[in-house]
């Protein structure tokens, strides 16, 4: 079974490219997007339209309620379910993994240790104070593991502390006795390259379109139903709209500027991650990438 990942910065056009190829080459798409997995935020996530979803089979869309937490294990389980579905029903159909959440893909490919539920211990972690205080606490609990992390790596520090609270075991010992489970499938990784100025222009156009399509009203509906603490509302686009609705952002123009600025920052981080964190990845511009993807799909069929 052929599995190809198409990564790229937010706004680079990877989703449109993948959809076009999936239609032409009879592929299915797994959405590697930390916001599209949520229901009710179609505009904020730039989710495929209902028409597009009728044209191509998409996995990992509209899975979680806005109050639920997303994590890499959920994406791994969904990916395995998608692969099994294809193997059972259309084994020669290629699967395109498409999105900007490259960290999730890297973690899935490197393997994940089985983890207990950690959500109930997050308040305890927060009670320890800011990230510096949390890191100091982790150093006391497990100096070896703490030294393997950056003192500003909020995600891993909080996860390690919650794991200790859940298991009463230092993280280094826990991970040594709970080995990583690999995905078991090869994934060829490509990244859509986009020049900086072109990307900023694309992000600006997309941000303006989101405002015009009603992202504020969409977020307001979720805010009223689930509250400002809903994890889905922490995403770029949604969180700025929450601030606007709470009077912390004065005008729609300022809202648009904030979403644009934060999306550009995200795109820069994504670009750096994609360039540095994968041992094997092919970076190509759109036309070259399209030709290469089609060639890879044809090679699989022959």
From Swiss-Prot:
Annotated site (Interaction with substrate tRNA): 101
Subunit structure: Monomer.
InterPro entries assigned: Dimethylallyltransferase, IPT, P-loop_NTPase
Gene of this entry: miaA
Family: Belongs to the IPP transferase family.
First-tier enzyme category under EC: transferase
Record's function text: Catalyzes the transfer of a dimethylallyl group onto the adenine at position 37 in tRNAs that read codons beginning with uridine, leading to the formation of N6-(dimethylallyl)adenosine (i(6)A).
Domain of life of the source: Bacteria
Thylakoid listed as a keyword: no
Keywords: ATP-binding, Magnesium, Nucleotide-binding, Transferase, tRNA processing
Binding site for substrate: 10-15
Ranges for region Interaction with substrate tRNA: 33-36
The reaction(s) this protein catalyses: adenosine(37) in tRNA + dimethylallyl diphosphate = N(6)-dimethylallyladenosine(37) in tRNA + diphosphate
One Pfam family from the record: IPPT
EC numbers: 2.5.1.75
Full protein name: tRNA dimethylallyltransferase
A GO MF label: tRNA dimethylallyltransferase activity
Residues that, per the record, bind ATP: 8-15
UniProt GO BP: tRNA modification
């Amino acid at each position: 079974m052929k599995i190809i990942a198409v990564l790229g910065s937010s706004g680079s056009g990877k989703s449109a490219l993948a959809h076009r190829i999936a239609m032409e080459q009879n592929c299915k798409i797994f959405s590697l997007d930390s916001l599209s997995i949520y229901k009710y935020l179609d505009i904020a996530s730039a989710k495929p339209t209902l028409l597009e979803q009728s044209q191509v089979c998409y996995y990992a869309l509209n899975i979680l309620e806005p109050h639920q937490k997303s994590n890499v294990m959920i994406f791994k389980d969904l990916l395995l379910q998608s692969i099994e579905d294809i193997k059972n029903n259309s084994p020669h159909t290629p699967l395109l993994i498409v999105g900007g959440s490259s960290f999730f893909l890297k973690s899935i490919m490197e393997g994940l240790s089985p983890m207990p539920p950690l959500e109930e211990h997050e308040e305890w972690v927060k009670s320890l104070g800011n990230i510096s205080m949390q890191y100091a606490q982790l150093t006391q609990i497990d100096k070896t593991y703490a030294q393997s992390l950056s003192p500003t790596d909020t995600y891993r520090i909080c996860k390690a502390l919650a794991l200790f609270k859940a298991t009463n075991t230092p993280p280094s010992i826990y991970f040594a006795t709970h080995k990583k489970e690999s995905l078991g499938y090869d994934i060829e990784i490509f990244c859509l390259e986009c020049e900086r100025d072109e990307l900023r222009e694309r992000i600006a156009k997309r941000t303006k379109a989101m405002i015009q399509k009603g992202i504020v009203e969409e977020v307001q509906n979720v805010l009223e139903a689930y509250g400002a603490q809903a994890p889905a509302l922490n995403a770029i686009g949604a969180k700025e709209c929450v601030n606007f609705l709470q009077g912390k952002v004065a005008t729609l123009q300022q809202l648009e500027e904030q979403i644009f600025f934060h999306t550009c920052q995200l795109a820069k981080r994504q670009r750096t991650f994609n360039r540095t964190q994968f041992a094997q990845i092919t970076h190509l511009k759109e036309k070259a990438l399209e030709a290469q993807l089609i060639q890879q799909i044809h090679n699989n069929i022959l």
